[in-house]
UniProtKB/Swiss-Prot annotation:
Protein name per its UniProtKB record: Chaperone protein DnaK
Cysteine-cysteine disulfides: none
Gene3D superfamilies per record: 1.20.1270.10, 3.30.420.40, Actin, Chain A, domain 4, Substrate Binding Domain Of DNAk, Chain A, domain 1
Modified residues (Phosphothreonine): 173
PANTHER family assigned to the protein according to its UniProt record, in alphabetical order: HEAT SHOCK PROTEIN 70KDA
Regions of compositional bias (Acidic residues) in chain numbering: 590-600
Inducing or repressing factors: By stress conditions e.g. heat shock.
Keyword Protease among record annotations: no
Gene Ontology molecular function: any one: unfolded protein binding
Length: 600
């Protein structure tokens, strides 16, 4: 079987790796670099990808950066007057990596495993697959970045049972995942993150600092000079990297601008202490998702066996120190953090092509999935952080007599009421045979495959008529949005519980009124007029309370009506039982001695 390459398609930088001689090997690009900037530029119709594009990103307005943030959203990028989808731009980056992987391998590459953030929803995962297809790649598997990282770190450690926290601070995004490693299985227990936090933010703080000191010294604002800003950006990134191994970084930018007396230069030294002081708030922000991930997994820091550092920004000493202090463990830095995700993808590619050890990857769904049911309630079928692939079915019924169709509103979120969650799609199952409410059996099934793609179907078990929907056009949910939804669910828990209880109370009352109406309408009902009058009065009072949303009275009247109905049922039972005895005694002789009689 041909080689399956592993690609880390990053927000800021990307990398490609392949299994070679039983090990994952990162492939260098034509410029000799092991990572490739995720940047595409156009200049006079010429397409430029990678390092060359990054070098002109500030000066060339026809440059696309961080398109990963847009993937799956339907937004477009305009370059030299032409609109491109994020998938098309991503495909250009993938195609570039595919080409230099082919040069290295000396053969055509058609298959790949591509990684995505753990928080990517269905639309974003599908869009990533589409980007691969545009680039001429058959995407064998989409896997979560932290899962890929754990593969690269843990492929030889699968005989141990460990809980691992993956701390992934890249150029543009931040993800935390907690995984359990046991018996060749990697299971994601929880995920959290911040999609607006990364190495770029550290660079930007240094750029602002340099702009500020130059303005104070020379009275010139460099922020309006594109060429100067390009050089400042490159100098800031270099200084940040230098400060990972030294305590002082020299910044020298000759001829950065010009004043009345001639050219001006920027010469300064940035200390690690000053850098850490300026970026302290960013480092502190990384700890919030760490605590959230532990909380979601139901763990404490003492339950974590290993902390894995992923992403180039984890080389920043203050970040390493914060992780160590917060989790009480020395982080594992044994694999290059820039390359570890691509290597993990290559390992999974090796498993697919038969060139590697078989490892089972079990990712999770980041938010609960369900449907809207009577009363505007969200009924959850698949809980948040459920391991995928998974399938879950539940039988529902109609809410009204002779209902010909049901609308299935597919929801994602953590709130009890449907309106507070995100609707992923809506479809209709019609052709339901006429029947009283509650009789038809509608089986709703949620299927999530290994790539996190959701398929929802509804089948009328009476007619076997079926409708389904694949969720592929929902707008993307960012880490921030998911965190917000989870946070809102926690903050509104008591109010949500009240609303859900009220909705359930109304549903119960409505069903009971329906049953009472059927009983009272029965012509052969043995209930006396006094009982009927009492039950009818309570039924009307219950209906009025329901119409007025008077839930205190509703609960009181429902309890009273249930007691009255029980008394009515008991009377009906006793009367029917007494009648049955009379019928039985009067028919005993007939039963024993009867003969059929033919009448002319």
């Amino acid at each position: 079987m041909s080689k399956v390459i592993g690609i880390d398609l990053g927000t800021t930088n990307s990398a490609v790796s392949v299994m070679d001689g039983g090990e994952a090997k990162v492939i260098t690009n034509p410029e000799g670099n092991r990572t490739t900037p995720s940047v595409v530029s156009f200049k006079n119709g010429e397409r430029i990808v990678g390092d060359a594009a990054k070098r002109q990103v500030v000066t060339n307005p026809n440059s696309a950066v961080s398109v990963k943030r847009l993937i799956g959203t339907g937004e477009k990028v305009t370059l030299e007057g032409k609109d491109y989808t994020p998938e098309e731009i991503s495909a250009m980056i993938l195609g570039y990596m595919k080409s230099y992987a082919e040069d290295y391998l000396g053969e055509k590459v058609t298959k790949a495993v591509i990684t995505v953030p753990a928080y990517f929803n269905d639309a974003q995962r599908q869009a990533t697959k589409d980007a691969g297809k545009i680039a001429g790649l058959e995407v064998e598997r989409i896997i979560n970045e932290p899962t890929a990282a754990a593969l690269a770190f843990g492929i030889d450690k699968t005989d141990k049972e460990e809980k691992v926290l993956v701390f992934d601070l890249g150029g543009g995004t931040f993800d935390v995942s907690i995984l359990e490693l046991a018996d060749g299985t990697f299971e994601v227990l929880s995920t959290a993150g911040d999609n607006k936090l990364g190495g770029d933010d550290f660079d930007n703080i240094v750029v602002d600092y340099l702009v500020d000191i130059f303005k104070k010294e020379n009275g010139i604002d460099l922020s309006s000079d594109k060429m100067a800003m390009q050089r400042l950006k490159e100098a800031a990134e270099k200084a940040k990297k230098d400060l990972s191994s030294t305590v002082n970084a020299s910044i020298s930018l000759p001829f950065i601008s010009a004043g009345e007396n001639g050219p001006l230069h920027l010469e300064t030294t940035l200390s690690r202490a000053k850098f850490e002081e300026m970026t302290k708030s960013l480092v502190e922000r990384t700890m919030v998702p760490v605590r959230q991930a532990l909380k979601d997994a139901g763990l404490t820091k003492n339950d974590i066996h290993q902390v894995l550092l992923v992403g180039g920004s984890t080389r920043i000493p203050a970040v390493v120190e914060a992780v160590k202090n917060d989790l009480g463990k020395e982080p594992n830095k044994s694999v290059n953090p820039d390359e570890v995700v691509a290597m993990g993808a290559a390992i999974q590619g090796g498993v697919i092509s038969g060139d590697g050890k078989d490892v089972l990857l079990l990712d999770v769904t980041p938010l609960s999935l369900g449907i809207e049911t009577m009363g505007g309630v969200m009924t959850v079928l698949i809980e948040r952080n459920t391991t995928i692939p998974t399938s879950k079915s539940q039988v529902f019924s109609t809410a009204a007599d002779n209902q010909p169709a049901v609308d299935i509103n597919v929801l994602q979120g953590e709130r009890p009421m449907a309106k507070d969650n995100k609707s992923l799609g809506l479809f209709k199952l019609d052709g339901i045979a006429p029947a009283k409410r509650g009789i038809p059996q509608i089986e709703v099934t949620f299927d999530i495959d290994v790539n996190g793609i959701v398929n929802v179907s509804a089948m009328d078990k009476g007619t076997n008529k079926k409708q389904s929907i694949t969720i592929s056009n929902s707008s993307g949910l960012s880490d921030e949005e998911i965190e917000r939804m989870v946070r809102e669910a926690e903050e509104n828990a008591s109010e949500d519980l009240r609303l859900k209880e009220e909705a359930e109370l109304k549903n119960r009352a409505e069903q009971f009124i329906h049953q009472i109406d059927e009983s009272l309408a029965s012509e052969d009902s043995p209930v006396d007029d006094a009982q009927k009058e009492e039950v009818t009065k309570l039924r009307d009072e219950l209906q009025a309370a329901m119409d007025n949303n008077d839930f205190e009275t509703l609960k009181e009247k429902l309890d009273q009506l249930e007691q009255a109905a029980q008394a009515m049922s008991q009377a009906m039972y006793e009367q029917q039982a007494g009648q049955a005895e009379v019928d039985a005694s009067s028919s005993d002789e007939t039963v024993v001695d009867a003969e059929f009689e033919e009448k002319n």
